[in-house]
Amino acid sequence: MKLSKKYTFRSRKVLLIILDGVGYSPKGPESGNAIAGAKLPFLNRVWNQFPTLHIQAHGKAVGMPSDDDMGNSEVGHNVLGSGRIFDQGAKLVSNSIASGDIFNGQAWKEVIGNSKKNNSTLHLLGLFSDGNVHSHIDHTKALISQAILEKVPKIRLHILLDGRDVPEKSALDYLNPFETWLNSLRKSGTDIRIASGGGRMTITMDRYEADWSMVERGWKVHVKGEGRYFSSAKEAIETFRSENPKIIDQYLPSFVISDNGKPVGKIQDGDSVVFTNFRGDRAIEISLAFTEKNFDKFDRGPLPNVLYAGIMQYDGDLKLPERFLVAPPAIDRTLGEYMASSNIPQYALSETQKYGHVTYFWNGNKSGYFDQNSEEYREILSDVIPFDQSPEMKALLITEALEKALNENKQDFYRVNYANGDMVGHTGNYLATVQAMEFLDGCVERLWKTCEKQNIVLLVTADHGNADEMFQLDKKGNVEKDSHGNPIPKTSHTLNPVPISILDPENKIRFNSKLSNPGLANVAATILDVMGYETPEGYHPSLIQNES
């Protein structure tokens, strides 16, 4: 890291606050903008009176295939922490399928070869939608089509219902045409069926070890075939909805498809299993359950001897899983790595739901520390409840811990993620999201007062939108309503930009408003600029206006 010679007032300490899921929309609360609907005396003052820009946080600006693709916390923190844009999992897998490279790779050959050699089942397990945040249904269909071409004897599908990155009750919109397609494959002689499933926030897709019981519930239905039996996934979904009309897809209970009283697709010795999610955070725990010899998170029972692969590798440091179909993005020279190599003290803090984002994803999908002597990571455990029941989440404890760290003044760079806007936003509960935002307003104000006292520059931004659009909108931007005239909740991320504001106790630093198409990739250089360091080669430029 080289000190910059351009500026006289730099060499400042920095706090970066990431308000997860807090995008910018000019629309009002009547359109589902929970940020506009909240009373935010401090944040509104920040956005209106302090230097503020709106920067891109979706689509190609964060490495997604197109500008129709939402941003998400994983890619957002990758870009924030690396200062550059890398092709992300969605694009890498799509490109590999289009080129055929995925099917010419060693891992795919081993997956198919194992099933053919043992005359066994190929199991495909993953999120079942086209949300393109964790997975895409087209990837699953491509794997199925290729497996049939290569004459795999039997295919079983274990579907995790979304309703989070897509409309909250859209499961049958994906399932019905998919089952029609499967039926045509069966008529052509393919032994293929859905075997199990459930909502993504009920089974299998836990992250950051927040709730291993989710993974255990998934294990029971996918592997053991233990659970409530149904003749089809459609019957399961319709039954659960009739029993609880308010339930949304992500919280649907687990189910097992049976035939004559027996599960149609238990995972057994000799089978091949591919996890079809490309995003890592919610893929790691189920991958450990399939591959870890000394596993102690729950009783797996007799562990089936299977050949397991991920569509991508989910943790490069842990080599998890060892077998993967597409290589993940190779993110190097991150801001955290540069700072650690120069012995610049860093502090990272969040609650469990976003802790991995300010560490693992920020550091380019790398676990652990670069240099434990100069880095301090702090996790505050999240509650295991639906977050609209407690919209403040752990924001108060985070604020108190960060105030303490700022007052101790041991580090030069601090980063924190407040999960509320995203995690409460994902519940689709507009009023709870308003409450979450109002609680955050006071937290950010407290931190600014501490920064003023310690002469620390404060940057406030977000990784993507969510709370800014809580109702489904039609193509004309009008709110879509249900049969009772109520707005249809939206639980997914948005395509909106995010604000970034700079609060300088010395009131010297200004943004360069003439910079073309700024995005999250500009934030890393901005941090270094304020701290008095030159921008590393290849990084997107700083947002700071040069001194005249």
From Swiss-Prot:
EC number in record: 5.4.2.12
Catalytic machinery residues: S73 (phosphoserine intermediate)
Reaction catalyzed: (2R)-2-phosphoglycerate = (2R)-3-phosphoglycerate
Residues binding Mn(2+) 2, per UniProt: D20, S73, D463, H464
GO annotation terms (biological process): glucose catabolic process; glycolytic process
Keywords attached to this entry: Glycolysis, Isomerase, Manganese, Metal-binding
Any one Gene Ontology molecular-function term assigned to this protein's record: manganese ion binding
Named cofactor requirement(s): Mn(2+)
Known pathway: Carbohydrate degradation; glycolysis; pyruvate from D-glyceraldehyde 3-phosphate: step 3/5
Cofactor binding, note field: Binds 2 manganese ions per subunit.
Subunit structure: Monomer.
Function statement: Catalyzes the interconversion of 2-phosphoglycerate and 3-phosphoglycerate.
Name assigned to this protein: Probable 2,3-bisphosphoglycerate-independent phosphoglycerate mutase
Organism per entry: Leptospira interrogans serogroup Icterohaemorrhagiae serovar copenhageni (strain Fiocruz L1-130)
Originating gene: gpmI
